[in-house]
Amino acid sequence: MSSALSPEGDRRYSDDSLSSVSTTSLVFERIQEKTEMDADNDKEKDPRALDDEDPLRDEDDLETGPFLGPGASLHREPMDRGLRRILIIVAVVFIGGWLAGLGIFIASGSYHHESDTEHDPDANSRGSGKSLSMDQLFDGTWSPKYHSISWIAGPKGEDGLLLEVGASNKPYIVVEDIRSDKNVATRDDAEPKASNSRTLMEHPYFEYDGKQYSPSWSEPSPDLTKVLLGVDRKKNWRHSFSAIYFVLDVKTQEAEPLVPDQVDARIQLASWSPKSDAVSFTRENNLYIRRLTGDKDVTQITKDGGPEYFYGIPDWVYEEEVFSGRSATWWSDDGKYLAFLRTNETGVPEYPVQFFIERPSGTTPEDGEEAYPEVEQIKYPKAGAHNPVVDLQFYDIGKKDTFSVEIDGAFADDDRIINNLLWAGDKAIVKQTNRVSDVLKVVLVDVPSRKGKTINTININEIDGGWFEISHKMTYIPADPKNGREHDGYVDSVIHEGYDHLAYFTPLDNSEPIMLTKGNWEVDDAPSAVDLANNLVYFIAAKESSIQRHVYSVKLDGSDLQALTDPKTEAYYDASFSKGAGFVFLSYRGPKVPTQKVISTPVSASSYERIIEDNAELADRARRHELPILKYGTLDLDTGVKVNYVERRPPHFDAKKQYPVLFHQYSGPGSQSVTKRFAVDFQAYVAAALGYLVITVDPRGTGFLGRKHRVTVRSKLGVHEAHDHIAAAASFASRPYVDAERLAIWGWSYGGFTTLKTLEQDAGRTFSYGMAVAPVTDWRFYDSIYTERYMRTPQDNPDGYDLSKVANATALGENKRFLLMHGVADDNVHFQNSLTLLDDLDLAGVENYDVHVFPDSDHSIYFHNGNRIVYDKLRNWLINAFNGEWLKVSNPQPQKDPVEKEKRHMVPQALV
């Protein structure tokens, strides 16, 4: 779930405002609303039935009469002539004024759906534009254009090289040197080492043995003389896939199979040697090396790979929760050694994932078995079950020898999670934790001597009682005595005084680092890059605000912290640095419309700036549409906790009215939903098009407010999160513009779990409705590595698991109604979670809910139009909830048909 679908309801706010829409248009809107409502009422069996939720209904409305029953009529007295004359005069004056106002309105041009000003999320909405639609959310209308840049290191150490694949009007794969770009201006008369672009692959296809292939994956060799090409790509799990691989010679533009004479060999992973002379690859879970020099032979490194043994690639749980990727292979920088993970799944139980509509395996069922679903058995360790046993192995390329290194005091096989490996010259730094992620060991392996030792052990229980997060940003700093670096070292994130910060460890076995950052703020998955020539470390941090991100640099001695982006301007940045850190690809993601550009770093010899994407069309679209008014703030909850929130208000927000409220959240440990990122998503649609308030709160357990805010949820997931959402809802319910009787909450994945825990804990006292998609309902059902990091094992913490389980069906029955949706083929949060909850509800006799399941859909629910159905269902269900429709079905009664009643009266009494 670390990578699980997590909605990002990040919005900006502005001050309160009254809509600038004219009185005339408001009159038209209310007339239209009333006309539509009357038309709807005409469809009812009883045309005089009153709708208590009708905002236009007035108790003094003579057309309906507040106390008139069916068949009743009004007796009207004749109107006095003097009064009639006065009313006629008033009507004439009103119509004249209305026509004059209409003329002024048309002349002003205010009716046009556009604005000359840039979309500013901090400004008050005019409410004069076009409306958002659900179709726009699904056709990409509101998706910012984001480009990805692949920086590559030059064969001779050149900086500023970009890899472009599939760019229009260019060869298919090209290496561009931005130092030769016309936008480069040299500083201090320094000459940029300009060079021409280099074509690696001319066309988006190649031929082999008379057959044409189109690659779906590519990776150039480090010396740029060859390109690995993957074709016929087939998805495996979230990150992994298999493909048929070829090696393209750049000079001749000719390709050959990676596995000689086996053109159809399906490969799970292929990686270049740093020297470009070999490729390691995993096939059928065994590891191989294909040499590209000399006899070009293939060496099989392992031989016992198969359904239960993996080499060089992760199994399901390691791919999902540890590496967030498909590789468990690491080449040493000199190409002499290959480190790889060996995973033994022998003891891991299997979970069956059923497919009722299609057969993902592509196999044809046996005769007579066509009507049976296909069942995929996945090795899935649930909390407390047997984990895969992993150990690290090394392969000596020259000696063709595989070996492992024993470490004194290492974790036992069933209590070890290997999180990361970093090559530091001919040494390897390995980070591993115990099973429940509260003890960290850093191991240093001298690979040539085949010896290793533990250089640092940290017990988090002695610090704050929390857990260690997994990070893959550890960066090697080689020694350079002439540049002030006497020894090899590395930069890594550490816990410092309750916050995540950067530290520089040197020499490699030093456990007392130089702190590079300090303070009551946190770095974000840092470092981003290191400039070795200038002893600078670049990183992204939430320094100015926990909901913003800016780019900074700091020297390796911890001095001279500088901002690369303007910290005085509210912003949320991502950054990707060139290999030498002389250039950076800056992605501004909000709060205004996102943009992207490449610039030179301040210490670069060249001054460079190039706009990659300005999203001009999106900016223009934002000017022409009614987007929500965004208001950010912090809430002081009744527990003394401060939480961030964002409130999305309708464009025509009127503080004198009362609005129903939808709370949207994710709430997972270390996550963050309240940020300054730009997004026009389902939450924006609900606020702007449906006219509801949509609020997101980041409760305890979420990220970037310090360790204390995060780790309080350990061993009892869902308890504090639910309490904070209830307290936040109660706080908003006390505001005059909030309809306290119409509060709902929804979420997906962990957000679905938190939705149910909130409804359970609240039992209808604050929230009336909830919508949960693909929720965990019992943490015993989720995977071991994620769950035990926050909950420990069920064997050690049975009470905590009971407390976190969505178990009080009776309390759920106290809510007005809730909605549950789940994909049947969810290999992440198993359908088992929803099924067991449904059984608990049945046993308790609880029926105030609706269910929709999606055959063959996984956790993201996309199969056969599933995703659109999810959001249509959320929309329609929510409208029915806030319109009071679900109150009508809570205790349904048969309608008495007057016609049938008359017929019954005509039947002889004896026959009745």
Curated annotation (Swiss-Prot):
<feature type="topological domain" description="Cytoplasmic">
    <location>
        <begin position="1"/>
        <end position="85"/>
    </location>
</feature>
<feature type="compositionally biased region" description="Low complexity">
    <location>
        <begin position="16"/>
        <end position="27"/>
    </location>
</feature>
<keyword id="KW-0325">Glycoprotein</keyword>
<feature type="glycosylation site" description="N-linked (GlcNAc...) asparagine">
    <location>
        <position position="808"/>
    </location>
</feature>
<keyword id="KW-0720">Serine protease</keyword>
<comment type="similarity">
    <text>Belongs to the peptidase S9B family.</text>
</comment>
<keyword id="KW-0812">Transmembrane</keyword>
<dbReference type="GO" id="GO:0005886">
    <property type="term" value="C:plasma membrane"/>
</dbReference>
<dbReference type="InterPro" id="IPR001375">
    <property type="entry name" value="Peptidase_S9_cat"/>
</dbReference>
<keyword id="KW-0926">Vacuole</keyword>
<feature type="region of interest" description="Disordered">
    <location>
        <begin position="1"/>
        <end position="74"/>
    </location>
</feature>
<comment type="function">
    <text>Type IV dipeptidyl-peptidase which removes N-terminal dipeptides sequentially from polypeptides having unsubstituted N-termini provided that the penultimate residue is proline.</text>
</comment>
<keyword id="KW-0735">Signal-anchor</keyword>
<feature type="compositionally biased region" description="Basic and acidic residues">
    <location>
        <begin position="30"/>
        <end position="50"/>
    </location>
</feature>
<dbReference type="Pfam" id="PF00326">
    <property type="entry name" value="Peptidase_S9"/>
</dbReference>
<dbReference type="InterPro" id="IPR050278">
    <property type="entry name" value="Serine_Prot_S9B/DPPIV"/>
</dbReference>
<dbReference type="GO" id="GO:0004177">
    <property type="term" value="F:aminopeptidase activity"/>
</dbReference>
<keyword id="KW-0378">Hydrolase</keyword>
<feature type="topological domain" description="Vacuolar">
    <location>
        <begin position="107"/>
        <end position="912"/>
    </location>
</feature>
<feature type="active site" description="Charge relay system">
    <location>
        <position position="826"/>
    </location>
</feature>
<dbReference type="InterPro" id="IPR002469">
    <property type="entry name" value="Peptidase_S9B_N"/>
</dbReference>
<dbReference type="InterPro" id="IPR029058">
    <property type="entry name" value="AB_hydrolase_fold"/>
</dbReference>
<keyword id="KW-1133">Transmembrane helix</keyword>
<feature type="glycosylation site" description="N-linked (GlcNAc...) asparagine">
    <location>
        <position position="344"/>
    </location>
</feature>
<feature type="compositionally biased region" description="Acidic residues">
    <location>
        <begin position="51"/>
        <end position="63"/>
    </location>
</feature>
<dbReference type="GO" id="GO:0000329">
    <property type="term" value="C:fungal-type vacuole membrane"/>
</dbReference>
<dbReference type="GO" id="GO:0006508">
    <property type="term" value="P:proteolysis"/>
</dbReference>
<feature type="active site" description="Charge relay system">
    <location>
        <position position="749"/>
    </location>
</feature>
<dbReference type="Pfam" id="PF00930">
    <property type="entry name" value="DPPIV_N"/>
</dbReference>
<dbReference type="GO" id="GO:0008236">
    <property type="term" value="F:serine-type peptidase activity"/>
</dbReference>
<dbReference type="GO" id="GO:0008239">
    <property type="term" value="F:dipeptidyl-peptidase activity"/>
</dbReference>
<keyword id="KW-0031">Aminopeptidase</keyword>
<feature type="active site" description="Charge relay system">
    <location>
        <position position="859"/>
    </location>
</feature>
<feature type="transmembrane region" description="Helical; Signal-anchor for type II membrane protein">
    <location>
        <begin position="86"/>
        <end position="106"/>
    </location>
</feature>
<keyword id="KW-0472">Membrane</keyword>
<protein>
    <recommendedName>
        <fullName>Probable dipeptidyl-aminopeptidase B</fullName>
        <ecNumber>3.4.14.5</ecNumber>
    </recommendedName>
</protein>
<feature type="region of interest" description="Disordered">
    <location>
        <begin position="892"/>
        <end position="912"/>
    </location>
</feature>
<keyword id="KW-0645">Protease</keyword>
